[in-house]
Amino acid sequence: MATPTPMFDLIKTLTEIPGPTGQEDLVHEWCADHWSSFSEHTEITRVGNVVARVGGEGPAIVILAHGDELGLMIKSVTENGLLHVWPVARDMRGRPSYSYSPVNQPVIVLADSGPIDGQLVYASGHVIGGGTQKDHFEWNDWFVDLGYTSKEKVESFGIHPGTRIALNPPTRRLGDTIVGKAMDNRAALSIATSVGE
């Protein structure tokens, strides 16, 4: 088992912050707070960019990265409390691309009342009846299960159509490799942070 390093710890911290497209605020806040310890000036602009000016005598350089990640949003809430999901990014084919391989993955729902853990599930024939096999997944076959059994309970947390969802697997080491979600582009944010320090 590989020994954790400061860079691994930094990547783990950044990749485990939920920040689906359109709701990257927690990532921006972490960067602004952390970068202010080594920069002359740090700000979050009106359009959501985090800018840190480090200063110095040498030539000016710019390090760029983005903080969002692939995410989902709630399309509807079923009467029995399951959440129909849809991709945040435009999906031309109407079904999950190879970018999504989240069967039975943990997720975090960014509800109005705060983050709520859930599980992304696929409606198998045992659940929806008929047992028919499909040659591809459709978005209508995917749900998030929060462990509640009523629409009213789920909605009481401030969960509604448009609420964002981020995948939530742990970032970990497999041999010499780091695996997890949001590596694109939180690894670059980790490098920018390390360079700034």
Can you name each region flagged by the protein language model?
Residues 1-197:
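N-terminal hydrophobic/helix-forming segments and targeting peptides
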